[in-house]
């Protein structure tokens, strides 16, 4: 670790069902924005990020957003893809075995597979952090998540939850540079959130992606 970098910890690519952002385009945009790393956290898949990581191993970090039977887990430095629909405990065990950094996606955002306070308290022993700032959340949700983290001795992650290129970098952390899950665990201790909540209109990117992918499937056309 050393110099301070700005990193968006929650990013979706075309690998997610509700995004059209290609990996190469995300890489170029991240570089343009001056982000220190590119972390891709697609829904229940690591296909795109593993492919991009082979091309840019010193810049791209593999993540995954895993839908469990309770809520979504945001995992960083994953080595093996986890399927959706498993229990949180199964996910935590498998992620711990990989040495991954474990955060919980958008607490209090109950309409988006967020987590309740009771659930977060139940799973505290397995967590490295929770997401305390998500650009697609309402401000009150982010403030509540940050308050919960502070009261329970947890560190926080922050991200744009980008589903379109224009969202990338809307939120994130400024923190010491890191190259492993263990270094990240140390870096988040002195991290600061940057950015602000996105307008509700960004949901357009997700809905457009879902619609276009549905049409392409019906026509038998592959997008990637």
Model-derived regions: residue spans:
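Charged catalytic cores and adjacent phosphate/nucleic-acid-binding surfaces used
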Residues: 1-17, 22-24, 28, 47-62, ...
